[in-house]
A protein has these predicted regions:
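Subtilisin-like serine protease catalytic core
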Residues: 1-35, 49-53, 81, 107-111, ...
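Hydrolase catalytic cores
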Residues: 2, 21-27, 154-230
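Glycine-rich, acidic and aromatic/proline-enriched surface loops and short helix-turn segments
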Residues: 7, 44-50, 152-156, 219-222
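Substrate-binding/access-modulating region of protease and related hydrolase catalytic domains
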Residues: 8, 25-110, 120, 145, ...
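Secreted peptidase-domain scaffold signal
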Residues: 91, 238-255
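Extracellular S/T/G-rich loop segment that most often corresponds to the catalytic His/Ser-adjacent loop
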Residues: 103-192, 243
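Secretory-pathway/membrane protein signature
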Residues: 130-133, 145, 227-230, 241, ...
Length: 255
């Protein structure tokens, strides 16, 4: 995922000049992990790395015991309360009728949950559906926090590959983990340009400003004639980074 975000060689990442910290929160296979490791990684990004954005290309299926008092949920909420943007994969469970919401922690209100589209801009069949109801509060989700919020390319994305594990230098992968990184890259570039304006006179981004950035995201999405109606699998539409930046300029009254 780091190559999709920050590669600056033959393949250029979404934000090649980004200052990147990488936290290992999954096991050796990269496919499973423990909640304690995930929550510690999130807190490390917040406390030790002073992160502006925490990008989570991971998730657990809803109903796996993570409630509003779980360590992962608390760690994410601490980050949001501290003015850190959290972007998380919606999940790859679109073909599983038994799973009715995006992954944890993408299902947390302030998090930007990301779905995946294919090269034609159509929603990837495996991209998770979001529920109309917040699983923590039992209340109906409302704009701009309906799940998922946004979709981005996530099918067969080529990136750098660890030469330590294989002779290949590049490989491709598919999933909402990939699309999450593209949204992270877009936001990183936006914060580089408008971060001080978003933070305001106190120089500190707060939860209300995170929410307004999400309003701008929803209003900027390429919604293919959806007229900004939320779709349970596609979100408010497909990422348009340039339009998002322009909408942020409008929402925050930036000259």
């Amino acid at each position: 995922m780091s190559g999709i975000l920050a590669s600056n060689g033959s393949f250029m990442g979404a934000a090649p000049e980004i200052s990147l910290s990488v936290a290992i929160s999954l096991g050796p296979s990269g496919k499973s992990g423990q909640e304690e490791m995930v929550s510690q990684a999130i807190r490390w990004c917040r406390i030790s790395q002073d992160a502006d954005i925490i990008s989570l290309s991971l998730g657990a299926n809803p109903g796996m015991g993570m409630d509003d008092e779980s360590e992962t949920t608390l760690a994410v909420q601490e980050a949001l309360d501290d003015g850190i943007f959290v972007i998380a994969a919606a999940g790859n469970t679109g073909l599983n009728a038994d799973i009715t919401d995006v992954s944890i922690p993408a299902n947390i209100e302030g998090v930007i949950s990301v779905a995946a589209t294919n090269k034609n801009g159509n929603i990837w069949k495996n991209s998770a559906f979001g529920s109309e109801t917040d699983s923590f509060t039992g209340e109906e989700r409302v704009f701009p926090n309906q799940k998922p919020e946004i979709s981005a390319p996530g099918v067969r994305l080529y990136s750098t590959y660890s030469s330590a594990s294989d002779s290949a230098l590049y490989a491709y992968s598919s999933g909402t983990s990939d699309s999450t990184v593209l949204v992270t890259g877009a936001l990183a570039l936006i914060l580089e340009k408008y971060g001080e304006d978003i933070a305001g006179t106190d120089g500190k981004i707060d939860y209300s400003e995170i929410n307004l950035v999400k309003v701008a995201l929803a209003n900027s999405a390429n919604s293919d004639d959806q007229d900004y109606i939320h779709h349970s699998q596609r979100g408010y539409g497909q990422l348009d980074a340039t339009a998002w930046a322009e909408q942020i300029r409008i929402e925050f009254g930036i000259e």
